[in-house]
Amino acid sequence: MLISAPTSYGKTFIMREILYLNQEKYKNILLVFPTVALLRENALNMEELNQDKKMGYNVIKSIDREIDCQDRNIFVLTPERAMQLLAQYPNIEIDFFFYDEMYKIDEDYCNDETDDNDEKKNSYTERTFLDEARAKTFRICLYLLSKRVKDYYLAGPNLKREKFGKGMQRYIAENNIQVKEIEFEPTKRIMVKAYNKVIDEDYTNLPYLEKPGIVKIHSKVNDRICDVVNYIEQKGYGATILYCTTPAKANEYATKLAKNHQVNVVKNERFSEFIEHLKRNYNIDGSINEWSFVNVLEMGFGMHHGKMPKYIQKEILDLFNEGIFNLLFCTSTIVEGVNTNAKNMVVLNHSKGTKELTVFDFKNIIGRAGRYYHNFVGRYFLVDKELEKFEHTEDLTLNFVTYDDQELDPVDIDNSEYMDLSDINKNLKHKREEQFKEYLLTNDIYEKNRLIKREYQEMLLRFLLNNNILYNKFYRYLSYPDILMQFTTYHAMNTVLDIFEESGLLDSIIVRRYKAVSNTYCNEGFHGLLRYEIDNARGDKVKHKSIDKAYMDAFKTQKDIIEHKIPKILALFETIFSYASLLRRKTLDNFSLSKVSRFYETGVKSYIGEQLIEFGFPVDAIKRIEDNNLRLLSMDASASQKYILEHLEDIKQLLDSYERGLLDKALKSICS
């Protein structure tokens, strides 16, 4: 079943109803969400449903521990984690899956690579195996799940069957999928023109209501923003999100509005503690005084974008939804499925990063004004004249290229069954399979990292078989009992990166950068990355670099390199090194880099630390707990939870007041 319904209609509510009604039928359930923010929100909802209705499932959000596939499990994962589940447990029987925001299988819809990015990518990063378009992950994950699971529910907003491309039509037909198009809008949305000399609300379809009078506004964009905000407040229209194309624009608009528009800052203890926490944890030699994010918060506005640490993003959303502040500047990350209490959406720009918005992006953004069962009327203000064209632009064609006639990428071809391909792609697949007969790499090894081209995996395998020096250098690290320490203290990551450079998978510029970032992070944590960027800005090593840009670059480095690309390198390396060792007849005793990958992904070393990260707890606070309670590093789930509860008062002494309050909430969730 595929359900297309307006934004905030309640598509996940339908999913929960399906699960409740079929709890006797479904044992292993997989719920796939596009972002970690949505994953966390829905995992919490599933935990509450599971507990309230006594459904008897384990709710699992990551694949970092041994899983009993014979038990009753609800997996709440991103597409990347879902692929990891299929790779680690190839024989798992999934009885039902839900796939949210399924339109992201199409590159025209899924331009995630431009989200929150205000500068063009360096050309060399486009050439590595680490930079595949995210739509490919969505597409291959959905393709594989559709092949192995009978019952599933696909969801997306504003999808029209008449706009399905040939490939999408074939996918629907081949899999006997019922399509339900719901056009009923539970929330009435009023378009407001604010790009000329006046604010003009469109009441064309509301003849029974008195239209507000036209209000004059200024021509300069920052003055116009101030006029629109004043208008919303004077009319009592409620909470407002202001969409900006990049974090830099969000900083600029929010800072200038704060100077010209006074708001009554709500006195709230948690809000005050949160600001003090930020000042204490993100200050490098007074840099906090120049960081617009904190300055804007103190003036009573919120700011949200995808480069921020996850717990900060979550706190900002919670404070906004609780009414601590009524104005929230954001980029595209907040409007892609995350629910808020916003009644108004002010759209300030017609682009998304360096690319222009699509009509689909536009509909998704304005769909965040008002929410089903919360606000029955929402308003969207168009401050940029270029936005009006989206009111009259036709929807994009949604395609599933695997089933289409166009020539496919090698990764798509290798992950598709022969009979699903067009004639041209069947020929390409046949040629590739003939080529693979000369390969040492087997299918089962390839499929553990099936989003990485087979050619690259073969290159790495042959290098590890032929280069004794680097193979043996890494092999010696395995003679020590603590593999994580070999990476965090003795720079085993440098050896891995040398192997990727010498094998031709990464060039020297990237390797030098990744080594520096990894070594700094292992020695000094995020503060080391931030200090490097702050020093660059203050020393004028990078021309015209602001302190705001320094914070942004540090967050981006952590998210892009530390949390994403290094774990991807490690996953491939673990698989190929293990197979090369088998061919070399070298003994490996329980070799696994999963603990190392989790360290880079999360920044913590203990099981309880990983649970706290999943809840949304500050990494630096967890490190303080771990450093002062080293026994936690060797404890399993139940032992670490018991230890924390027994030593809770001592542990709280290591935390600030904001962190203490957050810890209490986290433990209620983790230990329930």
Describe the residue ranges of each PLM region.
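Conserved segment of the helicase C-terminal RecA-like domain
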Residues: 146-152, 351-399
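Long, hydrophobic alpha-helical segments
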Residues: 389-441
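Structural recognition of the conserved hydrophobic beta-strand(s) that form the central parallel beta-sheet
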Residues: 31-32, 75-78, 98, 150-157, ...
